[in-house]
Regions:
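Alpha-helical transmembrane segments and their helix-start/interface "positive-inside/aromatic belt" motifs
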Residues: 14-39, 105-121, 179-194, 246-249
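Alpha-helical transmembrane segments of multi-pass membrane proteins
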Residues: 37-55
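C-terminal transmembrane-bundle signature of multipass membrane proteins
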Residues: 41-42, 189-267
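Perimembrane loop-to-helix junctions flanking transmembrane segments
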Residues: 52-72
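Short aromatic-rich membrane-water interface segments that cap or initiate transmembrane helices
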Residues: 65-77, 146-160, 221-231
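Generic alpha-helical transmembrane segments
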Residues: 78-89, 155-173, 235-239
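Internal transmembrane alpha-helix with an interfacial aromatic "cap," most often the third helix
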Residues: 79-141, 172-173
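Membrane-proximal helix-loop-helix units in multi-pass membrane proteins
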Residues: 122-186
């Protein structure tokens, strides 16, 4: 193993008290814990806001109250997510690593854990969205005085929650393909399929609303214009081969780290 690979490695701790091990655990997984707590707080805040303002000011898009309490939220969501996705993606690409030989097995393994942490946060966010607003979306089409593309649940689901998944996936895709040696200078097909599937839900939503405007007045779950959501939702199945990839690469890195640690102890 080259000296460059060794010097760039992250030290692996051993022994110590429970407190020190817990501290090391939270430090290693701080992305998952901090970001997870943040998305839970955002999800809870949006759900509370919808509970307070949906019926009070969200039943008529053309009412002054809707323009005051819901449209600024929509504009803010679009601006924040656009800036976050573009700025983060550009930063990760501009600071990318070009020499995979400088990434040692310990550093590589720590990055796999970070990647799993980000995926855990995405799963937590998807569950939060499903629990807090998806179940009521179809009902809102029957509740609003004049059914439009802008309802309280639409503003939360289609203009923030689903785009937020894309806002996390795109930078993560770039990070993984510029920081992990196994993905550098190549493309993971399962990873790409997940990103494209979630991304394409947004234009499919536009097609869905166009269809509701001209063809389907009722929210029929099995309507053909809803088939795209099912097909694109199936892209999540690609997480299975992606997980197999990651665990296989992590197993190899763990073996390398264990061998490296043993050689250090022997020396």
């Amino acid at each position: 193993m080259t000296q460059a690979r060794v010097t760039n490695d992250v030290a692996v701790g051993s022994g110590g008290s429970f407190a020190s091990k817990a501290s090391a655990h939270f430090k290693r997984n701080r992305i998952a814990w901090v970001f997870g707590a943040l998305v839970l707080a955002v999800g809870a805040g949006l759900r509370l806001y919808m509970g307070m303002m949906a019926f009070a000011a969200g039943t008529d898009y053309y009412s002054p109250e809707f323009q005051v309490y819901w449209m600024p939220l929509l504009y803010g969501e679009v601006i924040v997510l656009s800036v976050f996705t573009i700025a983060t993606s550009i930063y990760l690409w501009m600071t990318r690593e070009t020499d995979a030989s400088k990434i040692g097995p310990e550093l590589e393994l720590s990055r796999y854990w970070k990647l799993l942490g980000v995926f855990s946060v995405m799963g937590l966010w998807a569950a939060t969205v499903a629990i807090t607003s998806v179940e009521s979306d179809a009902a809102w089409h029957q509740v609003t005085i004049r059914d439009t593309d802008f309802t309280p649940t639409h503003i939360i689901i289609f203009y923030f929650s689903l785009p937020f998944l894309t806002a996390m996936l795109v930078p993560t895709f770039i990070w993984a393909h510029t920081r992990l040696p196994v993905y550098m200078n190549r493309v993971s097909i399962p990873f790409l399929a997940v990103v494209i599937g979630i991304l394409m839900i947004m234009p499919n939503y536009g097609f869905n609303e166009w269809g509701h405007t001209f063809f389907y007045a009722e929210e029929l779950f099995a309507a053909p214009i809803h088939w795209g959501f099912v097909l694109l939702g199936w892209s999540l199945f690609f997480f299975v081969p992606l997980a197999v990839q990651l665990f296989m690469y992590m197993g190899r890195s763990i073996s390398q780290v264990a061998a490296l640690k043993h050689s250090r102890q022997a020396a």
